Swiss-Prot record:
It comes from Escherichia coli O157:H7. ATP binds at G192, P193, P194, G195, T196, G197, K198, T199. The gene is ftsH. The chain crosses the membrane at residues 5-25, 99-119. CDD domains: RecA-like_FtsH. This is ATP-dependent zinc metalloprotease FtsH. Acts as a processive, ATP-dependent zinc metallopeptidase for both cytoplasmic and membrane proteins. Plays a role in the quality control of integral membrane proteins.
């Protein structure tokens, strides 16, 4: 940027100098007004007058010189001069030089060319590149001192680290692999959900490898000019060949490596041209020995099959969500830079954050540190981590939102309905927290936290989730009547309907339809797939699917209604507890379900306050329709209910 500014300043100074040299030359000597000149002529003091247009260079008889200008055309001037015997000399008007004439005639065109070059450089982001460098690669080569990340900074994905660490070992000691006839993979594709550490793992490879490391984004190839993408791919591999052995890292490769196909428009697809060139460079007629391509994406399903075949991306490394041990390791990495209180236990936090990615855990530690800073604390304690977890899972509190008592009561019944059904149906995740404080876009939230990491879900668990989703709407219907049911359950209905339809059409949980796939393919057209979609079911089958979905929802809807009707005393007691405390945790919910006095939440301002959640009769256990809930430690499915 500084070089460009200096260059333009130099050009401006040169142009100003040229204009000044081409301008009319100023006359030497002093200037005198025209009336004084006429008076001196009449007094016979002027010896010579050189007339050049309206300018007169005067030489007096005493040899003094000066210049004057004729303000208006004076027809008597020449007669007066001759009468007084003044020598009159006429001079032709000054003509511009040949160089000045050429410059003036070409200046507009040169100005337009300069403006065009300037804008082309700006559009290409070429602060330091020439106007014709569109096809040059934007890959940046990183050296050892530019990246400090190592494998020690990557945690929670040990298998992925082992896969990519093998590449680094090969680059350091290729003979150890070659003597056994082994060949290093030409390409490694890192696949995983967002935030799991794919790019961080690539940074660690760059920090560990002692070879040149080129990094580029998939969106840096294609721009406004045709052929730029393919040219940049060629240039990138040419640079890599000169620096071999080396590593090329392409982040978000799905931006350029999407599936080729029909698509829309029917015209030339610049992205396909770029992809074709990349396929040739990775494994074409000419080999690229010593160049390892590493790419990252969270959409492997949209990549072109030719890009994924052996010889291009030989190995796919799955970087998935971390398990409880991986989450603990990730938390310890991020906690190094945070002053911690003695009560901090990373294992406890890891068990309470199933489904969190590495980025989520980094955000958790940062939010906890911010909460501690707001409270002017010197260390971060478990209280701040609990607040940060609630904020990430349920959204930020909106205490400034004004709600009437009637709205609070309706929200309390709604959330209590979710919580009670979730505790009574089998195989459901435990209730972690219920609140009627508005969070995010919801007026209240019922959060279920799984007891462990889940891989799959049973039919019973899915039906329990459907019943729980309708618990909030049913609580409103039972308390206020069908005519006063609110729209707060709109998201619950949407989630339950999609869940039931998937059970019928994808997961084979319908006796009438059997274990067959009835769902339509949902690939987007712009991903290069065909525009036309085949219909694989008849109208009669579609009607049966709708009937099965409706029957599944009605069965679980009626089950939830029966559970709430049988436990109305708990519903009222939980509403009272929510109206008093606004937020209740698992211990308070345990007291309510057992019909005991509700203990106050931790940190409550009135430690002696209690709420008799039971009825006046003898305590009795809640009456579930199905068998009691049995914990499933292998399950990580959770819901954030309470769209109320």
């Amino acid at each position: 940027m500084a070089k460009n500014l200096i260059l333009w300043l130099v050009i401006a100074v040169v142009l100003m100098s040229v204009f000044q040299s081409f301008g009319p030359s100023e006359s030497n000597g002093r200037k005198v007004d025209y009336s004084t000149f006429l008076q001196e002529v009449n007094n016979d003091q002027v010896r010579e007058a050189r007339i050049n247009g309206r300018e007169i260079n005067v030489t007096k008889k005493d040899s003094n010189r000066y210049t004057t200008y004729i303000p208006v055309q004076d027809p008597k001037l020449l007669d007066n001069l001759l009468t007084k015997n003044v020598k009159v000399v006429g001079e032709p008007p000054e003509e511009p030089s040949l160089l000045a004439s050429i410059f003036i005639s070409w200046f507009p065109m040169l100005l337009l060319i300069g403006v065009w070059i300037f804008f082309m450089r700006q559009m290409q982001g070429g602060g330091g590149k020439g106007a014709m460098s569109f096809g040059k690669s934007k890959a940046r080569m990183l050296t050892e001192d530019q990246i400090k990340t190592t494998f020690a900074d990557v945690a929670g994905c040990d298998e992925a680290k082992e896969e990519v660490a093998e590449l680094v070992e090969y680059l350091r000691e290729p003979s150890r692999f070659q003597k056994l006839g082994g060949k290093i993979p030409k390409g490694v594709l890192m696949v995983g959900p967002p935030g799991t550490g794919k790019t961080l793992l690539a940074k660690a490879i760059a920090g560990e490898a002692k070879v040149p490391f080129f990094t580029i984004s998939g969106s840096d190839f294609v721009e406004m000019f045709v052929g730029v993408g393919a040219s940049r791919v060629r240039d990138m591999f040419e640079q890599a060949k000169k620096a071999a052995p080396c590593i090329i890292f392409i982040d978000e490769i799905d931006a350029v490596g999407r599936q080729r196909g029909a698509g829309l428009g029917g015209g030339h697809d610049e992205r396909e041209q770029t992809l074709n060139q990349m396929l040739v460079e990775m494994d074409g007629f000419e080999g690229n020995e010593g160049i390892i391509v590493i790419a990252a994406t969270n959409r492997p399903d949209v990549l072109d099959p030719a890009l994924l075949r052996p010889g291009r991306f030989d190995r796919q490394v799955v970087v998935g969500l971390p398990d409880v041990r991986g989450r603990e390791q990730i938390l310890k990495v991020h906690m190094r830079r945070v002053p911690l209180a003695p009560d901090i236990d990373a294992a406890i936090i890891a068990r309470g954050t199933p489904g969190f990615s590495g980025a989520d855990l980094a955000n958790l530690v940062n939010e906890a540190a911010l909460f501690a800073a707001r409270g002017n604390k010197r260390v971060v304690s478990m209280v701040e981590f609990e607040k940060a977890k609630d904020k990430i899972m349920m959204g930020a509190e909106r205490r400034s939102m004004v709600m009437t008592e009637a709205q609070k009561e309706s929200t309390a019944y709604h959330e209590a309905g979710h919580a009670i059904i979730g505790r009574l149906v089998p195989e459901h995740d435990p209730v972690h927290k219920v609140t009627i404080i508005p969070r995010g876009r919801a007026l209240g939230v019922t959060f279920f936290l799984p007891e462990g990491d889940a891989i799959s879900a049973s039919r019973q668990k899915l039906e329990s989730q459907i019943s729980t989703l309708y618990g909030g709407r049913l609580a409103e219907e039972i308390i206020y009547g069908p005519e006063h049911v609110s729209t707060g359950a709109s998201n619950d209905i949407k989630v339950a309907t999609n869940l039931a339809r998937n059970m019928v059409t994808q997961w084979g949980f319908s006796e009438k339809l059997g274990p067959l796939l009835y769902a339509e393919e949902e690939g987007e057209v712009f991903l290069g797939r065909s525009v036309a979609k085949a219909k694989h079911m008849s109208d009669e089958t579609a009607r049966i699917i709708d009937q099965e979905v409706k029957a599944l929802i009605e069965r679980n809807y009626n089950r939830a209604r029966q559970l709430l009707t049988d436990n109305m005393d708990i519903l009222h007691a939980m509403k009272d507890a929510l109206m008093k405390y606004e937020t209740i945790d698992a211990p308070q919910i345990d007291d309510l379900m057992a019909r005991r006095d509700v203990r106050p939440p931790a940190g409550w301002e009135e430690p002696g306050a209690s709420n008799n959640a039971g009825d006046n009769g003898s305590p009795k256990a809640p009456r579930p329709v199905d068998e009691p809930r049995t914990p499933n430690p292998g399950n990580t499915m959770s819901e954030q209910l309470g769209d109320k």
